[in-house]
Protein backbone atom coordinates (compact mmCIF):
# COMPACT_ATOMS: atom_id res chain seq x y z
CA UNK A 1 0.00 0.00 0.00
CA UNK A 2 1.39 3.42 -0.92
CA UNK A 3 2.33 6.03 1.67
CA UNK A 4 -0.43 8.45 0.57
CA UNK A 5 -3.01 5.64 0.79
CA UNK A 6 -1.81 4.65 4.25
CA UNK A 7 -1.99 8.26 5.43
CA UNK A 8 -5.45 8.68 3.94
CA UNK A 9 -6.70 5.60 5.78
CA UNK A 10 -5.09 6.74 9.04
CA UNK A 11 -6.77 10.13 8.64
CA UNK A 12 -10.14 8.48 7.98
CA UNK A 13 -9.69 6.41 11.15
CA UNK A 14 -9.05 9.56 13.20
CA UNK A 15 -5.31 9.17 13.81
CA UNK A 16 -4.68 12.81 12.91
CA UNK A 17 -6.53 15.92 11.82
CA UNK A 18 -6.28 17.46 8.40
CA UNK A 19 -6.55 21.23 7.96
CA UNK A 20 -7.49 22.68 4.57
CA UNK A 21 -8.54 25.98 3.06
CA UNK A 22 -10.48 26.67 -0.15
CA UNK A 23 -7.25 27.37 -2.08
CA UNK A 24 -5.81 23.99 -1.07
CA UNK A 25 -9.02 22.15 -2.04
CA UNK A 26 -8.97 23.87 -5.45
CA UNK A 27 -5.32 22.93 -5.95
CA UNK A 28 -5.96 19.31 -4.94
CA UNK A 29 -8.85 19.01 -7.36
CA UNK A 30 -6.87 20.63 -10.17
CA UNK A 31 -3.90 18.33 -9.66
CA UNK A 32 -6.07 15.20 -9.59
CA UNK A 33 -7.69 16.25 -12.88
CA UNK A 34 -4.36 16.56 -14.71
CA UNK A 35 -3.87 14.28 -17.72
CA UNK A 36 -1.24 12.18 -15.95
CA UNK A 37 -3.86 11.00 -13.44
CA UNK A 38 -6.63 10.20 -15.95
CA UNK A 39 -5.62 6.54 -16.15
CA UNK A 40 -5.55 6.27 -12.36
CA UNK A 41 -8.76 8.00 -11.26
CA UNK A 42 -12.03 8.82 -12.95
CA UNK A 43 -13.63 12.26 -12.70
CA UNK A 44 -16.28 10.76 -10.41
CA UNK A 45 -13.58 9.34 -8.12
CA UNK A 46 -11.91 12.75 -7.98
CA UNK A 47 -15.25 14.35 -7.07
CA UNK A 48 -15.86 11.77 -4.34
CA UNK A 49 -12.34 12.05 -2.89
CA UNK A 50 -12.43 15.86 -2.82
CA UNK A 51 -15.86 15.78 -1.17
CA UNK A 52 -14.61 13.38 1.52
CA UNK A 53 -11.71 15.74 2.22
CA UNK A 54 -14.00 18.77 2.19
CA UNK A 55 -16.43 17.15 4.67
CA UNK A 56 -13.91 15.50 6.97
CA UNK A 57 -11.10 18.02 7.24
CA UNK A 58 -10.98 21.09 9.42
CA UNK A 59 -11.68 23.93 7.02
CA UNK A 60 -10.29 27.40 7.62
CA UNK A 61 -10.29 30.56 5.55
CA UNK A 62 -7.58 31.16 2.99
CA UNK A 63 -4.63 32.56 4.94
CA UNK A 64 -2.94 35.89 4.48
CA UNK A 65 0.02 34.91 2.34
CA UNK A 66 3.52 35.62 3.55
CA UNK A 67 5.51 36.18 0.36
CA UNK A 68 9.04 34.98 -0.17
CA UNK A 69 9.03 32.17 2.37
CA UNK A 70 9.49 29.47 -0.26
CA UNK A 71 11.37 29.27 -3.53
CA UNK A 72 8.07 28.79 -5.36
CA UNK A 73 5.69 31.71 -4.69
CA UNK A 74 2.79 29.32 -5.30
CA UNK A 75 3.78 27.40 -2.16
CA UNK A 76 3.88 30.40 0.19
CA UNK A 77 0.19 29.96 1.02
CA UNK A 78 0.86 26.46 2.40
CA UNK A 79 3.29 27.80 4.99
CA UNK A 80 0.85 30.61 5.81
CA UNK A 81 -1.98 28.07 6.17
CA UNK A 82 0.06 25.88 8.51
CA UNK A 83 1.08 28.86 10.63
CA UNK A 84 -2.36 30.47 10.80
CA UNK A 85 -4.02 27.14 11.67
CA UNK A 86 -1.35 26.46 14.33
CA UNK A 87 -0.76 22.89 13.16
CA UNK A 88 2.01 20.62 14.40
CA UNK A 89 3.36 19.81 10.93
CA UNK A 90 3.07 20.87 7.32
CA UNK A 91 3.13 17.70 5.23
CA UNK A 92 4.26 17.97 1.62
CA UNK A 93 6.00 15.90 -1.00
CA UNK A 94 7.44 19.00 -2.64
CA UNK A 95 11.21 19.15 -2.10
CA UNK A 96 11.08 22.96 -2.14
CA UNK A 97 8.97 22.72 1.00
CA UNK A 98 10.61 19.76 2.73
CA UNK A 99 14.00 21.45 2.35
CA UNK A 100 12.89 24.46 4.41
CA UNK A 101 14.94 24.10 7.58
CA UNK A 102 13.93 27.19 9.50
CA UNK A 103 10.19 27.36 8.91
CA UNK A 104 7.68 26.72 11.66
CA UNK A 105 5.84 24.40 11.84
CA UNK A 106 8.32 21.84 10.53
CA UNK A 107 7.70 20.51 7.04
CA UNK A 108 7.59 16.71 6.84
CA UNK A 109 7.43 14.40 3.87
CA UNK A 110 4.46 12.01 3.86
CA UNK A 111 6.85 9.16 4.73
CA UNK A 112 8.23 11.11 7.71
CA UNK A 113 4.70 11.72 9.01
CA UNK A 114 3.94 8.03 8.64
CA UNK A 115 7.04 7.25 10.72
CA UNK A 116 5.80 9.55 13.50
CA UNK A 117 2.32 8.09 13.52
Predicted regions: what is each one?
Residues 1, 23-44:
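A short secondary-structure junction motif
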Residues 1-20:
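Short, well-structured N-terminal submotif of metal-dependent ribonuclease cores
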Residues 15, 54, 86-87:
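Residue-level detector of structured alpha->beta connecting loops
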Residues 23-25, 45-69:
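Acidic catalytic patch
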Residues 68-74, 97:
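Acidic, metal-coordinating catalytic cores used for nucleic-acid/nucleotide bond scission
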Residues 72-90:
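Acidic, metal-associated active-site segment
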Residues 84-91, 95-117:
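Acidic, PIN/NYN-like endoribonuclease modules and their adjacent C-terminal/linker elements
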Amino acid sequence: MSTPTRLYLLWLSGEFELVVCPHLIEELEGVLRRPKFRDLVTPDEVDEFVEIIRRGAISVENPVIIEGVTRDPGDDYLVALAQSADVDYLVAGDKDLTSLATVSPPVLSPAALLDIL
